[in-house]
Amino acid sequence: MDNKDSILQRIKKSVKTTDPDATVILYGSYARGDNRSDSDIDILVLIDKDKATRDDQKRIAYPLYDIEFETGFVISPIVFSKKVWETKHIITPFYENVTKEGMVL
């Protein structure tokens, strides 16, 4: 089984291969350091588009399935538009959580 840093680097490489301009942010229990053996790896991917589509989500997420299969870790990516994310018109608990504890990979 791979260690955390190795898996995070593989995730970043996979996303950047698919979208070189994307920003990859780790949040949740792995970012806080209180993950357990059954914790998933929460990833926010910000892309340079006006709006992230379902196709964008698939394009980013599908290559991560190989990493999940090979390592046994569950990866939970959320794809968002950088433009929408940075506008901050609506501050949600999710936004506050990622802003507070998120780590750019």
Regions found by a protein language model. Give the residues of each.
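Catalytic core of pol beta-like nucleotidyltransferases
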Residues: 1-23, 31-33, 37, 48-105
